[in-house]
């Protein structure tokens, strides 16, 4: 079991997790893990609680996931916090989500910064409410030079929108004669995505049992290994995170090719 150098919380290691951790090959750790944080509403409904209670419980799951990222030297973690479609939810729920973002940054930023976490945002951040946007921008600026772990928070993010915006940027350059269309390939296209300086995810985790990408990292996930669990996000803990890594290491990643 790896030694936790800087715990975000005081989560205890279960016997199940310890048994799983013994199966992990430290030389085959995924560099980039992405997570669709799904199931907060259902978790709250099953307990007769308001939906915001599920979102609040989900914040603690993120804390546990960050612990595991530290333990196993994960370099990049990208979490789907708020999609471009989430604006369709009731206004009180949307407001509560952004209040939770501000609360989380106020409570955790100094700890994250002192431990070398760099916070980044991907999505149409300029359209976020003023207060949360400013707090997020402060966190991004404060942690900009950190290198221990990059935490990408997808806010007001949509995979299709991201691709369309990248295409529009390249089309403008082509119209101005600044790029030859024959120069445009996958690598060139990737430079115009929100994740331009981030490697594609090796592993995408989907709690709640849903079998869809939900418009998340569509371009980047072409060869990503996907791991789905019926566990709802607020119940997602260290054991589930370690299980995902173990299962990932059991996959044969071919990237479209065949071994001969």
From Swiss-Prot:
CDD domains according to UniProt: Cis_IPPS (cd00475)
Domain of life: Bacteria
A GO molecular-function annotation: magnesium ion binding
Binding positions for Mg(2+) per the UniProt entry: 38, 225
SUPFAM superfamilies, per the entry: Undecaprenyl diphosphate synthase
Top EC class, one word: transferase
Record EC number: 2.5.1.-
Active-site residue list: 38, 86
Cofactor: Mg(2+)
GO annotation terms (biological process): polyprenol biosynthetic process
Binding positions (substrate): 39-43, 51, 55, 83-85, 87, 89, 206, 212-214
Free-text comment on the cofactor: Binds 2 magnesium ions per subunit.
Quaternary structure (record): Homodimer.
Function: Catalyzes the condensation of isopentenyl diphosphate (IPP) with allylic pyrophosphates generating different type of terpenoids.
NCBIfam families: PRK14830.1 (NF011405), uppS (TIGR00055)
Membership in a protein family: Belongs to the UPP synthase family.
Name of protein: Isoprenyl transferase
Gene assigned in the entry: uppS
